[in-house]
């Protein structure tokens, strides 16, 4: 089990020799698709000559785009797009409304696919699977749930035995839902390839919520359930403290709980809505790489390099989240824990291991600073709606390069929703965007935007964006210092609170230690570099309030709160 005492792996600060750079990502081909309303794509599967993309169409787009749907309500659609030149081939509509719908290929039946999401049955919104053929004909559908329905959708998975796992957050038992512990609990079902229910499972406690965010296949035939949860009282998910945790649950193939682990913040600032969430698992030979997001620098994130920020830059607003990656050993003890992002919200989508032991990470960002240096080429304003973000790290979590992708200028509104890996260098990426008026802006160069055929139509509705990228970075030219030996991150900081100076005493002498004092607006108000074991910072002229003190050298990387009285 994971050690209760927190240890963090203390990375070297890569100063002038830091090897981050705007990535040499080449977009080989791309195209946009949609109508005059929002057409949101969520998932993609690959066949030999084409892709199938699944998404959701708003009523305003019905009858105006590539896919012609009937009715005046949201519709789920599937688009068939050629692989060679990204031409729209055909598409089909289905009378279900499902955010985050997933499409999976049935590996046991050529030309058949599963659409997995939600649909109104039992008089409420519940978990649904539709089986379709290669012509878009519905073969069958099944629905699981109860008359109360679910509140939020969860993770979906095509399993190694050809079945489907679907999940959502439920508040009431009944129907297919065997038990609810309290609040919002995560409920999962597994059915076979013919739609027959094999098992159902509730994950939760008496806390307000336990949400299933993702479900992944384990190499032993079982499953990983990625969650965000509070935890207390009766239930089968218990975490050490009552706070928002990133929790991973390991299930057997039969849906039985084998173990669960909780990670996250120490809840040192509950008024700032400190929280963490589990998103992704990569199995390694010597452990795991876990992925999620978090908005703190305490608990399991102490020394992780979280980038301070508040929502909309409000002085008293909730903290913003970074992408959080942490490597653990086979006993799930943390080896290193690192954050990536800037002072706004950053979100993880998917992580792939590369042949050299490193990782390529796909996500989305609203940040324009910190690790997100490449945002400058898109030139977004502070109220931007986000861009896609890709970055590469080595096996020790050192950032090698990063790249934002999207249209340029103003509010932006680009997101990555699914990725197909072809090899370490090539990926097909699915996303959504507001197509630029000319079809070309920033990284976007589309000839198929719906607005191009109707210049008078407002340019604020979303199309979906399909593009193929190649990583052209020469990794033989990149080197980073070896990681230091793991030790506990500690430093004595006093007096705290203080009304004039704050002293720092390190555990060991160091040649160059950097200190930065940051106010609650994210501004560096004092800094100093010193050699030796101790030094101090002057705070007498600073306004009263809370500050963050960052201390970094070759052995120590930590952040502490300092109160100026």
What is each stretch, according to the model?
Residues 6, 18, 62, 126-127, ...:
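A detector of low-complexity, intrinsically disordered, Ser/Thr/Gly/Pro/Ala-rich segments
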Residues 484-494, 498-565:
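C-terminal outer-membrane/trafficking sorting elements
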Residues 11-14, 19-23, 44, 94, ...:
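Compositionally biased non-globular segments, especially hydrophobic aliphatic-rich helices
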Residues 1-27, 480, 503, 523, ...:
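Bacterial Sec-dependent N-terminal signal peptides
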Residues 22-481:
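A sequence-level/structural motif corresponding to short, flexible coil/turn segments enriched
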Residues 4-5, 84, 103, 109, ...:
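N-terminal cationic leader/targeting segments used for protein routing and processing
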Residues 11, 98, 319, 553-554:
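Helix-centric, low-specificity signal for extended rod-like, repetitive segments
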């Amino acid at each position: 089990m994971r050690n209760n005492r927190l240890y963090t792996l203390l990375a070297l600060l890569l100063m002038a020799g830091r090897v981050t750079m705007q990535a040499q990502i080449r977009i080989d081909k791309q195209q946009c698709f949609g109508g005059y309303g929002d057409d949101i794509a969520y998932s993609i599967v690959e066949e030999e000559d084409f892709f199938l993309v699944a998404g959701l169409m708003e009523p305003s787009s019905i009858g105006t785009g590539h896919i012609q749907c009937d009715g005046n309500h949201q519709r789920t659609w599937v688009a068939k797009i050629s692989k060679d030149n990204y031409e729209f081939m055909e598409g089909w509509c289905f009378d279900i409304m499902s955010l985050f719908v997933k499409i999976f290929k049935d590996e046991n039946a050529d030309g058949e696919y599963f659409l997995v999401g939600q649909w109104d049955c039992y008089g409420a919104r519940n978990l649904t699977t539709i089986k379709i053929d290669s012509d878009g004909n519905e073969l069958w559908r099944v629905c699981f749930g109860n008359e109360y329905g679910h509140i939020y959708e969860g993770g979906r998975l095509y399993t190694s035995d050809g079945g489907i796992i679907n999940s959502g957050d439920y508040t009431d038992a009944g129907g297919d839902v065997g038990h609810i512990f309290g609040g919002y609990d995560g409920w999962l079902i597994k059915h076979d390839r013919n739609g027959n229910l094999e098992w159902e499972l509730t994950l939760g406690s008496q806390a307000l919520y336990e949400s299933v965010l993702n479900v992944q296949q384990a190499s032993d035939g079982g499953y990983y359930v990625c969650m965000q949860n509070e935890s207390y009282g009766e239930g089968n998910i218990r975490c050490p403290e009552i706070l928002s945790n990133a929790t991973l649950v390991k299930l057997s193939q039969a849906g039985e709980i084998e173990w669960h682990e909780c990670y996250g913040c120490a809840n040192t600032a509950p008024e700032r809505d400190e929280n963490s969430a589990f998103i992704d698992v990569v199995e390694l030979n010597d452990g795991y790489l876990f992925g999620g997001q978090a908005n703190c620098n305490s608990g399991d994130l102490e020394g992780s390099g979280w980038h301070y920020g508040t929502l909309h830059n409000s002085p008293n607003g909730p903290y913003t989240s970074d992408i959080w990656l942490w490597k653990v050993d086979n006993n799930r003890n943390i080896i290193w824990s690192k954050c990536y992002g800037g002072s706004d919200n950053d979100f993880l989508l998917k992580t792939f291991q590369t042949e050299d032991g490193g990782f390529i990470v796909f996500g989305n960002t609203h940040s324009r600073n910190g690790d997100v240096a490449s945002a400058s080429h898109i030139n977004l304003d502070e109220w931007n709606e986000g861009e896609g973000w890709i970055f590469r790290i080595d096996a020790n979590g050192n950032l090698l390069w990063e790249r934002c992708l999207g249209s340029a200028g103003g509010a932006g509104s680009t997101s990555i929703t699914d990725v197909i890996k072809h090899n370490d260098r090539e990926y097909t990426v699915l996303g959504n965007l507001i197509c630029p008026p000319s079809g070309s802006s920033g990284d976007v160069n589309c000839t198929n935007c719906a607005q191009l055929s109707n210049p008078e139509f407002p340019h604020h509705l979303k199309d979906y964006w399909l593009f193929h990228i190649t990583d052209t970075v020469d990794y033989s030219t990149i080197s980073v210092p070896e990681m230091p030996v793991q030790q506990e991150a500690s430093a004595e900081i006093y007096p705290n609170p203080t009304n004039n100076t704050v002293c720092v005493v390190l555990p060991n002498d160091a040649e160059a230690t950097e200190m930065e004092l940051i106010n609650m607006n994210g501004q560096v108000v004092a800094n100093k570099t010193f050699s030796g074991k101790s030094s101090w910072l002057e705070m007498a002229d600073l306004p009263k309030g809370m500050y963050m003190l960052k201390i970094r050298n070759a052995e120590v990387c930590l952040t502490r709160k300092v109160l100026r009285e």
